[in-house]
Amino acid sequence: GKPSPQGSGNGWSGWYKEWYFRSLRELSYMINVINKNSLDWKPGEGSVRIKYTFFDGTERNYSPDFIIGNKMIEIKPKKLQATPLVQLKAKAASEYCLNNQMEFELIDPQILTDDEIFELYSKKEIKFLDRYEKKFLERYNKP
């Protein structure tokens, strides 16, 4: 993989039920939108690979975060949505969607509160990868 842009990813990865999440935003979207509305979905990775041409002319692949019905969903904070790389991928995804009767959405979901995260963790509904587990326990100062 390539290095992420400055400020991307808020440092939390793990599992919610059997679903892998790569950020608090993805986790929040899984819980507040997908789970709450019982939506049928699949991860974009492994389902869709969209070719795009990088700034240096090399061809790369992009996979969205979620596929929900005919919608392709990418989760990004507002502050990163206008960055050149996100725009490049969004353009490729939009063209792909146009040719495949799909819609592309770039979404910045409302993030779960600290209390909601801690409750999910306490009920063992979420499990962080080891390095994030340590960070989580330090942040919440819980044994």
Task: Give the role of each language-model region.
Residues 1-143:
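Electrostatic, structured charged patches in enzyme active sites and in nucleic-acid/phosphate-binding
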